[in-house]
Amino acid sequence: MDPVTHAASGALAMLAMPQRPATRWALPLAAFAAAAPDLDILAASGPLQTLLLHRGITHALAAAPFMGLLLAILARPLWRYDTRNAWSFGGVWAFMMLLVLLHIWLDALTTYGTLVWLPFSGERLRLNAVYIIDLLMTLPLLWGIWHGLRQEKKRAQAQGAIPFPFQDTASLTVSDGKPGVRLALFWSILLYPALALGCQIWHTQQMQASLAAQGRDIRQLVVLPDAFAPLFWRALYLEKLPARPADAPAWQTAVSYTHLTLPTILLV
């Protein structure tokens, strides 16, 4: 996913917590942690290295505890003894590790593939459920942040606190905006991905049935989200030629662009 989505998911996760450390650094640190695995692009010196290194070891499940530990050390304001409502270091470590895992999950939903099994396997995990930029995922996250901060501002002003956003502490650790914040987070990281994955599976089944009805010999088929998915998808398949000259390849890659709107039948 794009950096905005990753950062917004981290900030919203912090807002959704029942209680957070009373420091203005809480949301920025959570946003940074959720986007931190993408710092692997700094190790690449060109487009080819970026393609090879990106979504590598920093996106591996085995590396998540170590990434979480490093991020927890950097997030000292969250566990510092003089921070009101400070978390324990172990709690910050666990939260940061969960944000790294959230980053891995969101990237695995896309088509580019994530090396989640390193160092044990170089196979890339790709669920082909969402496009690399998906407003149906990003906008609810941004709305949730706006809604949560807006509710905190209202409550702070009603209680005579220092006017937001100049207050030095997030004193309102439990706000009336929590249900909306949590609903936005649930939609973007669980419900919408599940619906998109179900949509991808449905389109794949429809495409298989359509190609079989045409009598085509298809050996490999993949349905990918296109821009503005889940309304637009594209299907790629490997088809055996019925007859060929002696010097022609036995297989050809056939590309079919499918423009879909649910619940219409897949068109080839």
Task: Give residue spans per PLM region.
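N-terminal membrane-targeting hydrophobic helices
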Residues: 1-205, 210-217
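A very general structural signal that marks isolated residues within well-ordered alpha-helical segments
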Residues: 19, 241, 264-266
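Short glycine-rich, polar/acidic loop-and-turn segments at beta strand-coil junctions
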Residues: 45-48, 239, 264
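Generic structural hydrophobic/aromatic packing signal, biased to beta-strands
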Residues: 116, 190, 207, 221, ...
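Anionic group-transfer/hydrolysis microenvironments
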Residues: 136, 236, 263
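Leucine-biased recognition of intrinsically disordered, low-complexity hydrophobic segments
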Residues: 172, 266-267
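Exposed beta-strand-loop-beta-strand "reactive/processing" segments of non-cytosolic proteins
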Residues: 219-252
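Conserved small/polar residues in nucleotide/adenosyl-binding loops
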Residues: 258-264
